[in-house]
């Protein structure tokens, strides 16, 4: 087993003034000029106090500090390489200074790779550089991380596209793999062991492994060479509630999850849940959020482009024919829709369906999902359209908060 020294390139936890148990380093408290400081974009950790305790990578001293740590770590310890975790977390530059510093961060990556290469030569064995970045290549560039250039220049041996928050659905694996064709950089799909709110499945109400399986299979089918599983050592970041809060205890279900994530042949025979994340609260780090949303009015021009989009890289009909897939479900969690039932327009992949669920599923918090059995799903992109007919403004206004596609190979309990 290879062992890597891992560095969190910017940490959000220290930005919370109320998090007294989470310490701040002497370097930060003595050198506030090296931090992002003020102002802080809305929705970012530290915004409540208008001050960010993250490092400002526009500062030469900050970059040199990390490069020195990389060098010292490989000098003092016999690691197999380094992991630089940029998913935890942007921002890395002050507002208005991001674009001009894109080359700065790219040069920092070149310098980091040079350190790893130098230690590989001195130790006469290959050391690897792993780089973890958020899941959206375009969004990464907006944050100062030119992921495309990093891949095309081969600045990392393994490039992980991993969600900064919990497990998400949409990851730019296909794009990254296309950039890596000429240099052999391995692209991994990555996600946290925890998920956002999802319907009860397999006896669990929190973070069921079915979501991880779906995300992993999509990644493999897009060309990923492997899976990077983050935070799974935390019991609170596994399907739960867990039998024990001991970090060192994994029951059979969670061990099986780790084994399943290794290869497509296991994943395609296991239950999977393809879901749209619905983060709540401040400080959320994930992009491309499609829910929650209110239902738009057809009388005001709403149409097919309002559809929610989920990708399912599996041959649904073929899987059913070979007995691998038993059934499929569409699950929706909605609010304030009861008074507008006669106005709801419902389509799946362009086919108009009656808005009559087969049943409901409810968790211990009283949240309820409407279940539609065997909707007309397809391999690849699936669209789910929910609109209100007419032009009249509803009161209350119906909204959808969660959307899930379940591909089931065995009965859920």
Model-identified regions with their sequence ranges:
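Active-site-adjacent "subsite" loops/lids of carbohydrate-active enzymes
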Residues: 2-72, 76, 199-214
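Active-site neighborhood of glycoside hydrolase catalytic domains
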Residues: 61-186, 211
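C-terminal soluble interaction/assembly domains
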Residues: 166-169, 175-176, 180-211, 218, ...
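Beta-strand-rich interaction surfaces with strong enrichment in secreted/lumenal proteins
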Residues: 297-300, 317-318, 372-376
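Extended extracellular/luminal ectodomain segments enriched in beta-structured repeat modules
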Residues: 318-331
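Beta-strand-rich ligand-recognition modules
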Residues: 334-412
């Amino acid at each position: 087993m290879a062992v890597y020294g891992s560095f969190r390139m910017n940490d959000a936890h220290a930005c919370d003034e109320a998090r007294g148990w989470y310490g701040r380093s002497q370097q930060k408290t003595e050198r506030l000029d090296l931090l992002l400081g003020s102002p802080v974009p809305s929705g970012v950790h530290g915004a409540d106090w208008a001050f960010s305790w993250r490092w400002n990578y526009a500062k030469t001293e900050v970059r040199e500090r990390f490069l020195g740590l990389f060098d010292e770590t490989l000098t003092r310890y016999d690691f197999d390489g380094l992991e630089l975790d940029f998913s935890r977390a942007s921002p890395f530059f002050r507002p208005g200074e991001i674009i001009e510093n894109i080359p700065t961060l790219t040069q920092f990556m070149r310098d980091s790779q040079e350190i790893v290469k130098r230690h590989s030569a001195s130790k006469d064995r290959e050391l690897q550089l792993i780089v973890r970045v958020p899941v959206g290549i375009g969004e990464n560039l907006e944050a100062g991380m030119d992921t495309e250039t990093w891949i095309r220049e081969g600045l990392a041996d393994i490039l992980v596209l991993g969600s900064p928050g919990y497990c998400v659905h949409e990851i730019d694996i296909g794009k990254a793999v296309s950039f890596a064709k000429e240099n052999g950089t391995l692209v991994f799909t990555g996600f946290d062991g925890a998920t956002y709110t999802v319907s009860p499945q397999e006896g669990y109400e929190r973070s069921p492994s079915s979501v991880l399986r779906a995300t992993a299979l999509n990644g493999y089918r897009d060309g990923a060479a492997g899976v990077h599983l983050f935070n799974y050592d935390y019991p609170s970041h596994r399907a739960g509630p867990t039998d024990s809060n001991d970090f060192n205890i994994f029951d059979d279900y969670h061990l099986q999850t780790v084994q399943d994530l290794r290869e497509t042949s296991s994943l395609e025979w296991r239950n999977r849940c393809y879901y749209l994340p619905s983060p709540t609260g401040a400080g959320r780090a994930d992009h491309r959020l499609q829910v929650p949303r209110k239902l738009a009015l057809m009388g005001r021009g709403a149409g097919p482009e309002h559809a929610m989009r989920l990708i399912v890289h599996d041959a649904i009909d073929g899987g059913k024919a070979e007995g691998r897939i038993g059934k499929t479900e569409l699950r929706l969690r909605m609010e304030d829709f009861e008074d507008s039932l006669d106005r709801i327009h419902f389509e799946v992949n362009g086919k108009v369906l009656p808005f009559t669920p087969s049943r409901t599923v409810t968790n211990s918090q009283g949240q309820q999902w409407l279940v539609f059995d065997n909707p007309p799903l397809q391999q690849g992109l699936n669209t789910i359209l929910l609109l209100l007919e007419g032009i009249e403004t509803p009161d209350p206004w119906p909204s959808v908060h969660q959307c899930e596609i379940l591909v089931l190979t065995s009965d859920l309990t």
